[in-house]
Amino acid sequence: MAVKMLNVPSLPNIPWQEKPADYKLSSPVWRYSENPVMGRNPTPEIARIFNSAVVPWEDGYIAVLRGEQVNGIPYVYLGHSKDGIHWDVEREKVPFVDDNGNPKMPHYAYDPRLVKVEDTYYII
């Protein structure tokens, strides 16, 4: 299967794995045979982590991640990867600011996304 991304520069190092010939589930989407790529407790502060947005960055990838605490409350964290499979997750939560630049941490950060506008990425 060929992967075609529209309106973006070529990504020659994007990790991709073909669906195994013996894959029997009817799901139309094949992911990766060794999922999950991030296990439980990736840092002492995070009980579970979910990939929400990954983008190519410099010589690898960055991701904004929903990291659920032991109490179930999610916050946003930043991850770095050279290959898109093996990740290092920062221990500090991503700091947010309001329109005036004042610190404003969301009480519940769920399903963050990255949007690139010109040369700047924004977390929404």
PLM region spans:
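Beta-rich carbohydrate-recognition and catalytic domains
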Residues: 1-107, 115-124
